[in-house]
Structure formats: structure tokens, C-alpha cells
Amino acid sequence: MNNPLVNQAAMVLPVFLLSACLGGGGSFDLDSVDTEAPRPAPKYQDVSSEKPQAQKDQGGYGFAMRLKRRNWYPGAEESEVKLNESDWEATGLPTKPKELPKRQKSVIEKVETDGDSDIYSSPYLTPSNHQNGSAGNGVNQPKNQATGHENFQYVYSGWFYKHAASEKDFSNKKIKSGDDGYIFYHGEKPSRQLPASGKVIYKGVWHFVTDTKKGQDFREIIQPSKKQGDRYSGFSGDGSEEYSNKNESTLKDDHEGYGFTSNLEVDFGNKKLTGKLIRNNASLNNNTNNDKHTTQYYSLDAQITGNRFNGTATATDKKENETKLHPFVSDSSSLSGGFFGPQGEELGFRFLSDDQKVAVVGSAKTKDKLENGAAASGSTGAAASGGAAGTSSENSKLTTVLDAVELTLNDKKIKNLDNFSNAAQLVVDGIMIPLLPKDSESGNTQADKGKNGGTEFTRKFEHTPESDKKDAQAGTQTNGAQTASNTAGDTNGKTKTYEVEVCCSNLNYLKYGMLTRKNSKSAMQAGGNSSQADAKTEQVEQSMFLQGERTDEKEIPTDQNVVYRGSWYGHIANGTSWSGNASDKEGGNRAEFTVNFADKKITGKLTAENRQAQTFTIEGMIQGNGFEGTAKTAESGFDLDQKNTTRTPKAYITDAKVKGGFYGPKAEELGGWFAYPGDKQTEKATATSSDGNSASSATVVFGAKRQQPVQ
């Protein structure tokens, strides 16, 4: 290896200085002093980089909106009840996407009825196991699907409801009546890779729920036989929605499917999503469809960032000075959604109209594949191997849009975490943990303002999901909070606490650190006679994590000899162990890399705290917007305990597989990871050098910022 940094280290005694950048929230600034020559070493500082824009939509597995019911007590009635952005409820990680969202389902299960306690739902969803009903699902139910785009695996959207009993409280002048339920979309396996280019057609279904207003009806959509739109929300699953075609016997060539369907085009090369939301009309013999087989109500336009998209929905069936008897008359500036599936095969979305009159959810997918794996006829193109179904050619190369990994310390395993293209939001066990304080920059998720108003380089905190806090008190499952209740198992009577240390305040698109899961048993769980103070705390697992928003491959630089500097977390063992945390302090854990983008090579070194010789050297090759390589210790090994002067145990790592990526708009940041469980070679070296019996092992995550010379 011809590494000038390593060659220089062999001739001179480097002194490293690592200090925080006062104005930039922490900086990696390591400078060496050559004792053989008086010339000063070059000084570096972090490059300035564009900070992430504030994200109105923080992403998630899915969202639901509940139907409204208006108080219509004479003389004390509410004139209207609008929909609000705050009405969106996170669904959490679904048990299975085809099943109803657990949180919202448990709410509706408790709704009282006058006799019919069935939960009715979209025909393609899994029937409810509700003890008193069959959920109204059956083979003869009306259809709702886009032709040729029916076999969803990762995302489902739909509706479910009960014929709720009227709420009558005459002493408080209150009467509410009408159905109670939700519309929703939710998915699993948010996409880590998407097609790098090309245009792909997605089709699916969409659903709506309206506000309530005295005297309001939507006769072009729903027959207001029970005062839908007036006393309670009109919605796409209402039994009086009679104007969309739901039956195969009346399907026409110009129909795109059954019910309310979507037709979207995703231009992955230009990161754009466009499309339309339509109704497939039931009959030409009425005045609601202008003698067409389909009626378009919205056009969608969104920008794709990572595996998420945000944009607008424009109402297309509206005219000035004309009253429409449907709710789709206002544009929306709140369209958001995301891609699900290993290659972005499916997507889900939602929006609320700007007039707060209607909320919409939907799901769409690429063309269904036939049994032989080819896309069904009529597609814009069959998928090539390695591409999403419906992609247009063999050129459907995939690109990685994010990294999110967890490395366990006890068994040295690496597993993928879910992520919604937000490095500042950790998703573990279906629970979303904000890594940065609410009052910080860039959409409430940036720097940690620490002591004396300064910026802390790393942040340490504890996070207890709201659901678990309540479960610990009541021992029952809770609903509606922005967490996934009990997704990691039965937490009733327990409080699961996550201890997190995250680095670094000068990294905007990359976050990495330490994660510890703890279960605190309640007094009842700890023992019948125990007091709350006696509740036992069990440390479940300690691990490391890294997640980052990958640079667009078209934006990867072509420069040579680009310097990145940063820090790292490490755990190294061979019987005894050494651990070190990220730091910007002088003598702390240090990382330095030289990247030759032109030749697609990366070399680097990780140096442990209070050491001069590097702990690991790393060599790798750049592939697209990421890199792979190997890490190894020096031939003399790594001293695990410097204080043991007579018999210092050592670790020998010969061939640890490193993976990583470049992050930010212009590859301003890089990071990577490796977990090395040991091998026969290191076991032999360990036994020879330190008289041990176990193979050396290591777990490491690292991150660094691009540097520029100090002017």
C-alpha cells in the first residue's frame, strides 16, 4: 500500500490536535507536526455545506384520518367541523400491511353500536377478527382496484368503520350520529434502493374523508341519505357511494379499474412524481360524470428526496363561481408519501386540502408480474432482473438512497434498520426516536445546544415511548401516539427505555452512535409485594448504529486527494476488551481519510484515544455513491490495556469487511461500519501473542466531514 499518510507516520512522530469549530458547531481539525523539518503541516477546516431543509413531513410507516361527527343539537349545534393537519395519526409499523392498523382498529373496536357491531372495511383488506362480526368482507363485495396493479405486498390503503350508535347527552345539549372509522395507508420495508433512472408507471387506489358542515352534501359523490357531509363525514367506503363502478359486469375498456384509482408516473432520473386521481364512473346515464367513463379530480406533482416525496395536489374539477357537489374543489400543498419494498415497487401517500374539507390517502404499485416473473401485458415495459416491476428496460440500474444499520456488540451482527430518508430520526423496533432536540435548527432536528449555550459535539439522552410510559402505569396498550405500541413484543407492565449517544453536531446528513435498550419492570412485574422503587432494570442489548442520506450518484465529485476528518466509536475484544467513543477533544478517537474520486479509491486510518499509532487502516474502492473495503490492525496488533505493562493483551484484525457511503448534496460527509467476529487466523495470533483462546473481534462505526485548507 502506497499511502503517504502511513509513510509519513513511519518517519515522524505526529501530534494530533482535534478541536471544535466555534462557529460551525464542531469541526474535525487534526494537524501533525514534523519534528524532522520546521515546515508547518497544512491546517484544515470543515467545508461549508447546505443544511437540510425543514421537513414538514417527518415520514413514517403510515397515517390515518378519523371520520368526524358534528354536534347537531338544535340551538347548540356546531356549524362545521373541519379537518386539521393535527388530525393525522401515525399508524406505526403494521403487523402485516393487509391488516387494519392496530392502533386505530383498537379505537374503533371500542365504539358502541345499536346492534350491528361489525367492522366494515375495504374489500381487499384482511377481514377483522372482531369477536362480534365478520367485518362485512366477502367474495361478492364491490371491487376497488386498478387493473393490472392489484397484488400489493408492502403498502395498503383503505377504510374501515362501524355503524356507531348515536351519542346523546341532552343535559349538555349534545347529539352526534353517523358512522365512525378511519381512512389510512401504511406500509413496511421502506425502500433503501430505487431505480437510478427511467420512468415507471404506478397505479393503485385512493380514499377520502370529508369535513362536516350544516346543510352540506356531496350528491355527485355520495347520496346523502344519512346526512353524510352534514352530520358526519362522507367517505369513499360509505354504502351510499353509488357513482363509481365497482362491478366487473359493468367494466368498460375506458375504465382504469374499479372505484377510485390513481395513475402515477415516477421519473427517477429527474426525481419527479406526477399523476392523476380519478373516479371510474358507474354509468353514463347520470349528470355526475359529464358523459365520460372516468372523472379526474386531482393532478399530483412531487419532488423525490431519498425514499420520500413531497409536493402538491391540484384540484382539476373546479370552476370559478360554480358550486360543485363534491369536496374536491381545493388544491393541497401538503402532498407527501414514500416508497416501500426493496426496490421501490410500491408507494403510499396522503394530503389534506388547503380548505380543510377533504383528506386523501392512497397506495400504488408497479405492474403486476405474471407467474414467470415478467410484467403483465399492457405494461410500459417488463422489469429487468435487479429492477422494480414495470421499469422500462434493462437499464433499470438501482441506486442506494440511504444507509441505516445496527451493529450488535455481543454477537457482532449487522442488521438493516428502517429509515425514512431522515438521518436525524432513528427507527428501532418500529419506534421513531428523534436524535436531536426539538428546538434545534433545520426542522427542529439539528444541533444540540449544550453547556453555556454552546454546541455539544455528541448528544446523550434517554427516550421512552409514550405508549410504554402509559403501559407501565396501566398495563394496557395505548393508541394514537407517534410510536409503535408493543411492536417489539409484549411491553405491558414494562417501560422500554432507549439510551442514545449520537455524533456529530457538524454532520447534517449522517448520524452514528451508541444505542442501549433497557426494560424497566413495573412493581407488579417485579413481584407482588415490591414497591415501585424496587422495580428491576434489565439491560437488554447494547449496539452501535449509523444512518445517512446518500449523495445522488450524479453529484459524486471527481476530485483527487480529498481529505475527510472525523471520529469513531469502537469496541475491540479478545477476552478482555477496549471501548472508545467519538470525540472532538484533543487526543480523542480520530478518523482521517483521503479519497481519490477520480480513481475511485479511499484510504484511511482510525486512531484510538490517547494513542499515536493508528488502530485500523482502511483501504477500499468507491462504487457509485458508496464504498467497500477492508480494515486491519497493525502487524503488532492493538494493545487492549495500555496500563498492563507486564502482559498486555492484544487484538489482531486481519480482514474486516468495511462498508460505507457518501452523504449530503455534494458528498460533504462520509461514514462507514464493520463488525468483525474473528477468524482462525486471528485466533492463532491471539493464542500465540497473548496466550488467549478466543479470536479477536471488533465493532466500529465512523463518520467524517470533508476538509478544506484554512485560508
Curated annotation (Swiss-Prot):
It comes from Neisseria meningitidis serogroup B. Belongs to the TbpB family. Isotype II subfamily. It comes from the Bacteria. Neisseria acquires iron by extracting it from serum transferrin (TF) in its human host. Acts as a TF receptor and is required for TF utilization. Involved in the initial capture of TF. Helps select only those TF molecules that can be used as an iron source and concentrates them on the cell surface, maintaining the iron-loaded status of the TF C-terminal lobe until its delivery to TbpA. This is Transferrin-binding protein B. A lipid is attached at C21 (S-diacylglycerol cysteine). InterPro entries: OMP/PagP_b-brl (IPR011250), TbpB_B_D (IPR001677), TbpB_C-lobe (IPR035316), TbpB_C-lobe_sf (IPR038197), TbpB_N-lobe (IPR035313), TbpB_N-lobe_sf (IPR038669). The gene is tbpB. Residues 33-58, 79-105, 118-146, 225-251, 370-396, 437-492, 682-711 are annotated as: Disordered. It is found in: Cell outer membrane; Cell surface. It holds the Pfam family TbpB_A. Residues 1-20 form the signal peptide. Residues 46-56, 119-146, 474-492, 684-699 have a biased composition (Polar residues). Gene3D superfamilies: 2.40.128.240, 2.40.128.250, 2.40.160.90. Changing R219A: Wild-type binding to human transferrin. N.meningitidis cells will only bind to human TF, not bovine or porcine TF, explaining at least in part the bacteria's inability to cause infection in non-human hosts.
